[in-house]
């Protein structure tokens, strides 16, 4: 199952004068939503898609209309009545409402990232989970620290703390939904400490719980030129101004 959390408040976009939710904004003749979802075009017929959105903003009708236009075979929309404490809690509530079996694999992806031609990496097939990364500058990312330079095994993840040059793209895989759920529930049990450390309930730091339990977590590095971000008004504006097709 591919899970798309999209229940954020889009405050930066609202403050910049945008009236509609970020995912509805136009980009290259489509919505940003459609551009992001086309990342998984090869899976439109084979995978279920779960969208977790805010109630009361017309999200369900918009998502289902776009999914029908794109040809996504099995879309499901869960709407939330109240804000969450972060992306991880949004995903957790969506999985619960959708009745996702704990044995199912889940792939979580941001609705403001475009990953043209995505294909599941074969080397991650025998892992308990994986994070996609690019090499980039700055402190505003989620980060992965490899166990060594000779392996793709992950020793640690962090949020807004640069522990390596490997920056998460917002694509997170868990071989079992139950592992994600357990890690998220552990974080919620100590939400005060977790929020003090990370600011909100992000997905990437949850992998530390799984790593501590002996799970085999790996990373896959994508070329930076193959990942396009629209998480801020500046990033979105740059994509609009580029007037180029996304490879």
Indicate residue ranges for each PLM-predicted region.
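Short beta-strand-to-loop acidic/aromatic patch adjacent to the donor-nucleotide binding site
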Residues: 103-114
